[in-house]
Amino acid sequence: MPGNNSAKGTATGNATALWRNAQLATLNPAMDGIGAVENAVIAVRNGRIAFAGPESDLPDDLSTADETTDCGGRWITPALIDCHTHLVFGGNRAMEFEMRLNGATYEEIAKAGGGIVSSVRDTRALSDEVLVAQALPRLDTLLSEGVSTIEIKSGYGLDIETELKMLRVARRLETLRPVRIVTSYLAAHATPADYKGRNADYITDVVLPGLEKAHAEGLADAVDGFCEGIAFSVKEIDRVFAAAQQRGLPVKLHAEQLSNLGGAELAASYNALSADHLEYLDETGAKALAKAGTVAVLLPGAFYALREKQLPPVQALRDAGAEIALATDCNPGTSPLTSLLLTMNMGATLFRMTVEECLTATTRNAAKALGLLAETGTLEAGKSADFAIWDIERPAELVYRIGFNPLHARIFKGQKVSP
């Protein structure tokens, strides 16, 4: 294989576990393509990768282990990463889905009590325990497809206590399943009815004090916002981001989904982890993201569910050198999707992304979009031993198949956790 096709550890002592007789898609950026390695082995020591590369290059001090698994020639990829979800919410919006199919407009749905108002009402009303119980099946579905890291946003409270409740529930989920959960504070998601037409007051009274509390309680790993005509302006989001920056919290942004307000450029000016959606992103915005190292997170589930016509400018992002990630955008209204494998197929089919781009988008680039690239997202020495073993003949099957899950095993922090 061309390039550096191994990752050697520096620590001494036997490996904790060996996965032998495998084929690797390392996603190592120092290698060509997906970083494929044949006749490969992964050595794990104390939950971290000590070596990932050709069996012939395995150091002697790692050649024996407490446990050895013969992978039978199967493919191993980094564990998948869903870097944009709204996984915690109350109720569901199946009724408005039926209304939309029958021709109801957004306004008619809203008047009937649907839309985000419905999710806010249900999320406010439910206890932590019920929200956990409702979120677990969604979480389990993602984990069953080889996902080991998931971002979860608040944003269906729109008052301080419910926003914090959602973040606490997300933290609770991490204690109930073998998964890494990253939280984003998204009070700047919409304006509640009692602040209609008073965005500035809502930010002053709710968003900023809630951010302070979320930070003080260690509930927020990042701060998000929705920059759009139906949500918040660039100037309004700038206030939120300035407060996040003062507290040392990274930012990310829903931007350019329905129009181009310049949200991506705002995100880039803060060196945001990511800017997400981006259907109406222009060339200037794409270049700004690339220059800032801000990942462009595309969300084909929302594009599909909303029957959008405006495609995100994938070629402009490529030309600018921006890194692209894909995510489910799991939410009750516009993307009730809990399959990252299907998301990859949508990225390829709807957005014309390549197999290599789709695999990179749900591993390495998704890790970067969460600020976790030093920890996970590739099969390299020193990183957490998070990987997925697949019953496939070639990695393209993960993108090509629809409604099929070929996961053989999921390894999280060096432990086999499913199925």
Swiss-Prot record:
<dbReference type="GO" id="GO:0019557">
    <property type="term" value="P:L-histidine catabolic process to glutamate and formate"/>
</dbReference>
<feature type="binding site">
    <location>
        <position position="86"/>
    </location>
    <ligand>
        <name>Fe(3+)</name>
    </ligand>
</feature>
<comment type="pathway">
    <text>Amino-acid degradation; L-histidine degradation into L-glutamate; N-formimidoyl-L-glutamate from L-histidine: step 3/3.</text>
</comment>
<dbReference type="GO" id="GO:0005506">
    <property type="term" value="F:iron ion binding"/>
</dbReference>
<protein>
    <recommendedName>
        <fullName>Imidazolonepropionase</fullName>
        <ecNumber>3.5.2.7</ecNumber>
    </recommendedName>
</protein>
<dbReference type="InterPro" id="IPR005920">
    <property type="entry name" value="HutI"/>
</dbReference>
<feature type="binding site">
    <location>
        <position position="329"/>
    </location>
    <ligand>
        <name>Zn(2+)</name>
    </ligand>
</feature>
<comment type="subunit">
    <text>Monomer. Forms a tightly packed homodimer in the crystal, but this seems to be an artifact of crystallization.</text>
</comment>
<dbReference type="InterPro" id="IPR006680">
    <property type="entry name" value="Amidohydro-rel"/>
</dbReference>
<keyword id="KW-0479">Metal-binding</keyword>
<keyword id="KW-0408">Iron</keyword>
<dbReference type="GO" id="GO:0050480">
    <property type="term" value="F:imidazolonepropionase activity"/>
</dbReference>
<feature type="binding site">
    <location>
        <position position="93"/>
    </location>
    <ligand>
        <name>4-imidazolone-5-propanoate</name>
    </ligand>
</feature>
<feature type="binding site">
    <location>
        <position position="254"/>
    </location>
    <ligand>
        <name>Zn(2+)</name>
    </ligand>
</feature>
<comment type="similarity">
    <text>Belongs to the metallo-dependent hydrolases superfamily. HutI family.</text>
</comment>
<feature type="binding site">
    <location>
        <position position="331"/>
    </location>
    <ligand>
        <name>N-formimidoyl-L-glutamate</name>
    </ligand>
</feature>
<keyword id="KW-0369">Histidine metabolism</keyword>
<keyword id="KW-0963">Cytoplasm</keyword>
<feature type="binding site">
    <location>
        <position position="84"/>
    </location>
    <ligand>
        <name>Fe(3+)</name>
    </ligand>
</feature>
<dbReference type="Pfam" id="PF01979">
    <property type="entry name" value="Amidohydro_1"/>
</dbReference>
<feature type="binding site">
    <location>
        <position position="86"/>
    </location>
    <ligand>
        <name>Zn(2+)</name>
    </ligand>
</feature>
<feature type="binding site">
    <location>
        <position position="156"/>
    </location>
    <ligand>
        <name>N-formimidoyl-L-glutamate</name>
    </ligand>
</feature>
<feature type="binding site">
    <location>
        <position position="329"/>
    </location>
    <ligand>
        <name>Fe(3+)</name>
    </ligand>
</feature>
<dbReference type="InterPro" id="IPR011059">
    <property type="entry name" value="Metal-dep_hydrolase_composite"/>
</dbReference>
<feature type="binding site">
    <location>
        <position position="334"/>
    </location>
    <ligand>
        <name>4-imidazolone-5-propanoate</name>
    </ligand>
</feature>
<dbReference type="GO" id="GO:0008270">
    <property type="term" value="F:zinc ion binding"/>
</dbReference>
<keyword id="KW-0862">Zinc</keyword>
<feature type="binding site">
    <location>
        <position position="156"/>
    </location>
    <ligand>
        <name>4-imidazolone-5-propanoate</name>
    </ligand>
</feature>
<feature type="binding site">
    <location>
        <position position="333"/>
    </location>
    <ligand>
        <name>N-formimidoyl-L-glutamate</name>
    </ligand>
</feature>
<feature type="binding site">
    <location>
        <position position="189"/>
    </location>
    <ligand>
        <name>4-imidazolone-5-propanoate</name>
    </ligand>
</feature>
<dbReference type="GO" id="GO:0019556">
    <property type="term" value="P:L-histidine catabolic process to glutamate and formamide"/>
</dbReference>
<feature type="binding site">
    <location>
        <position position="254"/>
    </location>
    <ligand>
        <name>Fe(3+)</name>
    </ligand>
</feature>
<feature type="binding site">
    <location>
        <position position="257"/>
    </location>
    <ligand>
        <name>4-imidazolone-5-propanoate</name>
    </ligand>
</feature>
<keyword id="KW-0378">Hydrolase</keyword>
<feature type="binding site">
    <location>
        <position position="84"/>
    </location>
    <ligand>
        <name>Zn(2+)</name>
    </ligand>
</feature>
<dbReference type="InterPro" id="IPR032466">
    <property type="entry name" value="Metal_Hydrolase"/>
</dbReference>
<comment type="function">
    <text>Catalyzes the hydrolytic cleavage of the carbon-nitrogen bond in imidazolone-5-propanoate to yield N-formimidoyl-L-glutamate. It is the third step in the universal histidine degradation pathway.</text>
</comment>
<dbReference type="GO" id="GO:0005737">
    <property type="term" value="C:cytoplasm"/>
</dbReference>
